[in-house]
Amino acid sequence: MGLCKCPKRKVTNLFCFEHRVNVCEHCLVANHAKCIVQSYLQWLQDSDYNPNCRLCNIPLASRETTRLVCYDLFHWACLNERAAQLPRNTAPAGYQCPSCNGPIFPPTNLAGPVASALREKLATVNWARAGLGLPLIDEVVSPEPEPLNTSDFSDWSSFNASSTPGPEEVDSASAAPAFYSQAPRPPASPGRPEQHTVIHMGNPEPLTHAPRKVYDTRDDDRTPGLHGDCDDDKYRRRPALGWLARLLRSRAGSRKRPLTLLQRAGLLLLLGLLGFLALLALMSRLGRAAADSDPNLDPLMNPHIRVGPS
């Protein structure tokens, strides 16, 4: 169990494997829609995760995704295509998760952001509307654009290298008028920003994606005495009396309420009783010490007392 860092501050057992933070279902739908999220216990057992879709083996961040109630994440197009291949008379229990064989349709008594988002997504296709008990609709098939592949641009470098202009072409190009060196550009409309597209045709490199920023809704203006919840500080050994220091710090920082008249009288009575007992103990110790050193109380010093054989 952990505490989510969002303003709701809800206790949750869900853990984002990519950002390594506890997340509630509200943050899961709003800010971690394409992250691998499972229970915190599973992350403790094995923190490795696969960022690709298990149906097409393509990164999840490249396409639209949907999350089932078991928190497994798939591309919506892949899940829709797989479910559409089943017969039309398939029972709702026959639509199962490809990963854990759990139900795709959320239970009717299950409420939450994940279940609500899944119901809204399933309501857009007929095979799911039949399982949800909704009337069928006319589906509009909109082809999803395929992601660009770097192999499409692999032959452009050879084209760029083979099309090097000769000296005669350079001379003829320099002799042309100056206004032919630049293509005329249409005037940009004031209410619409101008868009530019740059294509690098030489030295193709594999596409890489930068890691996404860790989602953290905590305010930047933290209290100077509080420290961030980082991984290095989370698992380090705590001192034995750390709880006592935190308790004293919390009591010293809190505002004390003024004592009532009855509380003041009880406090004075307690202090007076403690002082009287301390005075009795001190006088008893001093009196016993004086009696031990008094020669009049020593029987050997008394002439009227004889010790030994008569």
UniProtKB/Swiss-Prot annotation:
Residues in RING-type zinc fingers: 53-101
Q: Record keywords: Metal-binding included?
A: yes
Outcome (variant: residue 53 to A):
Impairs the interaction with OLGA2/GM130 and cis-Golgi assembly
TM annotation in the entry = 267-287
Give residue spans, biased composition: Polar residues: 148-165
Q: Please tell me whether the keyword Cytoplasm is annotated for this protein.
A: no
List the B box-type zinc finger ranges: 1-43
* Any one cellular-component term (Gene Ontology): Golgi apparatus
Basic and acidic residues bias locations: 213-224
Instruction: Tell me what PTMs the record reports for this protein.
Output: Phosphorylated.
Lumenal face of the membrane: 288-310
| Keywords attached to this entry | ER-Golgi transport, Golgi apparatus, Membrane, Metal-binding, Phosphoprotein, Transmembrane, Transmembrane helix, Transport, Zinc, Zinc-finger
The record describes its membrane topology as: Single-pass membrane protein
Q: Which GO terms describe its biological process?
A: regulation of DNA-templated transcription; vesicle-mediated transport
Just give the chief location class.
Answer: Golgi
Molecular function (Gene Ontology), one example: zinc ion binding
Cellular localization per UniProt: Golgi apparatus, cis-Golgi network membrane
Q: Which residues lie on this side of the membrane: Cytoplasmic?
A: 1-266
Tissue-specificity statement: Expressed strongly in the exocrine pancreas.
What family classification does the UniProt entry report for this protein?
Answer: Belongs to the ZFPL1 family.
Q: Which PANTHER family match?
A: ZINC FINGER PROTEIN-LIKE 1 (PTHR12981:SF0)
Q: What's the domain remark here?
A: The B box-type and RING-type zinc fingers although degenerate play a central role in function of the protein.
Q: How does it assemble?
A: Interacts with GOLGA2/GM130.
Function according to Swiss-Prot or TrEMBL? Required for cis-Golgi integrity and efficient ER to Golgi transport. Involved in the maintenance of the integrity of the cis-Golgi, possibly via its interaction with GOLGA2/GM130.
Name it: Zinc finger protein-like 1
Organism encoding this protein: Homo sapiens (Human)
Point out the gene that encodes the protein.
ZFPL1
